[in-house]
């Protein structure tokens, strides 16, 4: 087999948020499958697990437009196509809608939504060059059901859901598939970032007691959360499948929550959700 033939047979994946959690697990599994992986993350080169002959680690803040443009220019100089794009970069802002500073809201959307849009724009020329290429956007159950005191995170994921649906429609003529991955809680750095920081609410905030009760509840939920590996296995399996669905809800409890949201009247659901999340406050 000639060098050119080998190059054409090499599958290529680009992954954001690749140094931890779901992104890292996807990178490792695709490397095991023989993919050439471009691992993009703020600290990708510091991740020892990514030291692999087929992996090129790139340190980047995906919300930096100029850096992102340069990275994809370099990738495009080496690759003619991309088989799989996995958008896994993201984080959560926890707090009440009223008390969360607007600067934090803008940062939330910058990473979770606007940066992803730019990644897709830069990657599409490569994706269009490969039949049956796929884009996996990491959403959340919060993209379908807004969570108490995770309003801005939920809003960023709702935006991602609408964007992905539109993108899927637009890319159909180019044979580029778009898939939303909607897991429930996943054990990763996400909960550490969201729940370990000081609350935006002051002690005299009207939301302080409920915010602390919700934080305690969510932290407990993450003790029995899905593993990043379980979610990554689903993504990698789908990346090698010919046909995929528009979205995949991952986790039985997640499916139950969405079912309740869709079946119950909004007032009933709201009361039930608050009762469950704030139960520890009432017990105190």
Curated annotation (Swiss-Prot):
One of its GO terms (molecular function) is oxidoreductase activity. The keyword Kinase does not apply. The keyword Oxidoreductase applies. Pfam families: adh_short. Its EC number is 1.-.-.-. Substrate binds at residue 140. Keywords: Oxidoreductase. It is an enzyme of class 1 (oxidoreductase). InterPro entries: NAD(P)-bd_dom_sf (IPR036291), Sc_DH/Rdtase_CS (IPR020904), SDR_fam (IPR002347). The active site is at residue 153. It comes from the Bacteria. Transmembrane segments: none annotated. NAD(+) binds at residues 10-36. Belongs to the short-chain dehydrogenases/reductases (SDR) family. This is Probable short-chain type dehydrogenase/reductase VdlC.
């Amino acid at each position: 087999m000639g060098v050119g033939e080998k190059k054409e047979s090499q599958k290529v994946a680009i992954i954001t948020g690749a140094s931890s959690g779901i992104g890292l697990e996807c990178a490792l599994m695709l490397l095991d499958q023989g993919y050439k992986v471009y691992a993009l993350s703020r600290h990708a080169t510091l991740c020892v697990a990514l030291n692999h002959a087929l992996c090129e680690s790139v340190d980047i803040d995906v919300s930096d437009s100029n850096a992102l443009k340069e990275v994809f220019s370099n990738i495009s100089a080496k690759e003619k196509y991309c088989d799989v794009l996995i958008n896994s970069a993201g984080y959560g802002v926890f707090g009440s809608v009223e008390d969360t500073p607007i600067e934090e809201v803008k940062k939330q959307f910058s990473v979770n939504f606007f940066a992803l849009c730019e990644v897709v724009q830069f990657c599409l020329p490569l994706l269009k060059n490969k039949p049956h290429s796929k884009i996996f956007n990491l959403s959340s159950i919060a993209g379908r059901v807004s969570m108490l005191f995770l309003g801005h995170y939920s809003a960023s994921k709702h935006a991602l859901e609408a964007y992905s649906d539109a993108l899927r429609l637009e890319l159909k003529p180019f044979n580029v598939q778009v898939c939303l991955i909607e897991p429930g809680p996943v054990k990763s750095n996400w909960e550490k970032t969201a729940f370990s920081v000081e609350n935006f609410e002051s002690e005299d905030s009207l939301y302080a007691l409920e915010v602390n009760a919700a934080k305690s509840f969510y932290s407990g939920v993450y003790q029995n959360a899905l593993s990043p590996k379980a979610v990554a296995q689903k993504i990698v399996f789908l990346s090698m499948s010919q046909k995929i669905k528009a979205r995949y809800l991952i986790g039985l409890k997640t499916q139950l929550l969405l079912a309740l949201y869709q079946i119950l009247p909004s007032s009933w659901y709201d009361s039930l959700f608050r009762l469950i999340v704030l139960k520890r406050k009432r017990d105190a």
